[in-house]
Design a protein with these regions (language model features):
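Catalytic cores of RNA-modifying enzymes
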Residues: 1-221, 225, 269, 278-281, ...
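Extended, compositionally biased low-complexity polar/Lys-Gly-rich tracts
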Residues: 55-65, 230, 257-258, 263-266, ...
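Long, well-ordered amphipathic alpha-helical subdomains in the mid-to-C-terminal portions
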Residues: 190, 213-262
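Conserved Class I S-adenosyl-L-methionine
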Residues: 246-288
Length: 288
């Protein structure tokens, strides 16, 4: 089954007849390539189809991806802020799927409803909220089973390939994979840059770096300290960063890099992901 508004002509007609324009502040660029829609569904189903896992979608828009998600006939939690698309969902397809629950308003204020759910998440994420949403998922969702997200291609390359504060932070929770570049012409209105699909799968609980709010705070503090001066030696950042001005924390970090054979003259970009995770685990052990 396809969404009621899927062709480019249908989208333009819907927007025009309702005196609507795509809202840049909400990151509204509507996916119009059905090959990509099918790809998202196909590359995700193995992670929830055989188990009792629920689904969620952040930003349903015109329902292009929502329809195939709802056809899995799982309890599904939908998040949408724009009144026009909330009303579209209510008047066209929500009544066909009794297992769907729609949360109206800002997703950042509503995601708490599913923090404890065993859920697989989909989302076409606005650029200005991408990091915040992924951080919330990494730190607040206790039982989530993974997610596939549409993000800007530059962000996808950075979070999957580069050594950055966010990529290493998320690595402590799960595995991040670059799935597919999505050409900007697959959207309407056509954005200025290409997008990409990433998949994040959480590590088994026993392998996750952080297990409590306190762990998260320590891990975040370590990364903020080191990446405060990305091209500085980590010993310099530890000494000078505003995030590390605590003798107990500084001493624990020094002991941690000694035990993990990481040189204090290293720069963050010279360390690999495994070294960061090993260092983080040692630091958490020392401070526990």
């Amino acid at each position: 089954m396809y969404a009621p508004i899927i062709k480019l002509s249908e989208i333009k007609n819907f927007l025009s007849s309702n005196s609507l324009v795509a809202q840049k502040k909400f990151g509204q660029n509507f996916l119009i390539d059905q090959n990509i829609v099918r790809y998202i569904a196909e590359c995700s189903k193995d992670f929830f189809e055989k188990e009792n896992v629920e689904l969620a979608e952040i930003g349903i828009g015109l329902g292009t991806l929502t329809y195939p998600i709802l056809e899995f006939e799982r309890p599904t939690y939908l998040f949408e802020i724009d009144r026009a698309y909330i009303e579209l969902a209510k008047t066209t397809y929500l009544n066909l799927f009794p297992k769907a629950v729609l949360y109206e308003g800002d997703a950042l204020e509503n995601l708490h409803h599913i923090f404890s759910k065993e859920v697989f998440i989909f989302g076409n994420l606005p650029y200005h909220l991408t990091s915040e949403i992924l951080t919330i998922i990494a730190t607040e969702f206790k039982n989530w089973r993974g997610g596939v997200f549409m993000v800007q291609k530059e962000f996808a390359e950075r979070v999957t390939g580069e050594i950055s504060s966010l990529s290493i932070f998320l690595e402590g929770m799960g595995k991040i994979e670059f799935l597919k570049k999505v050409n900007k012409k697959c959207f309407y209105p056509v954005p200025k840059i290409d997008s990409a699909l990433i998949r994040i799968l959480p590590r088994p609980k026993e392998e996750r770096l952080f297990h409590s709010k306190e762990d998260i705070a320590v891990w975040s503090r370590l990364l903020r300290t080191f990446f405060w001066g990305k091209r500085k030696q980590i010993q310099v950042s530890l000494r000078d960063s505003p995030f590390s001005q605590d003798p107990k924390f500084q001493e624990a970090v020094r002991k941690a890099w000694e035990k993990t054979n990481i040189s204090p003259t290293s720069r963050p970009e010279e360390l690999n992901r495994k070294q960061f995770l090993t260092l983080g685990q040692e630091l958490l052990d020392l401070l526990s």
